[in-house]
Amino acid sequence: GVFNAAFGGSDNSLLFQNIREEQGLAYSVYSYQNNYFMSGLFHVDITVNPKQAARVVESVVKLIDEVKQTEFTDEVLDIYKNQIKIDQIMRSESAKARMSKNAKDLLYFGKPIPLEEMIQGILSVTASELRAFAVKYLNISKASFCSVGKLMKKEAKRIDALLDGQ
């Protein structure tokens, strides 16, 4: 939703701007979510040189700490909400996407949620709600890390320490 768009779900997100554009540490960096009825997963996916892995994880941990401490400004939040609104309107043009959305709505809510109602829900999200979400759900000590390819032992140990809060 809105938190994902702001944190890492687009090219103007915090993750992309900080890790790729400002620090130049990764080619690809983004976040995404898997929502389920009573649970879910929040993922951060990064394509990085193995020698930079610990530095990138450290930057992600710092960004998570920042969003837990500081609220997004209303101006910035409006950009992300409007981005999602436009995306939802565009998706509603596809019959396949509408069927998939309606099926999920039936499973989660017992009825299809009209596009207008969904957009109103997106536009009503506040900065304090996003911060509360981050505080409640983004717990680094519960994070897991997966690497594809060869990761140096030194980098792996540093990543373990970062995820243990050290």
Question: PLM features: what roles do these ranges have?
Answer:
Residues 1, 130, 145:
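Short, conserved catalytic/metal-binding micro-motifs enriched in Asp/Glu and His
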Residues 11, 52, 155:
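Short phosphate-engaging motifs
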Residues 17-125, 140-149:
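M16 family metallopeptidases and their MPP-like homologs
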Residues 125-137:
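A short, acidic, amphipathic alpha-helical segment used as a generic capping/interface helix at domain edges
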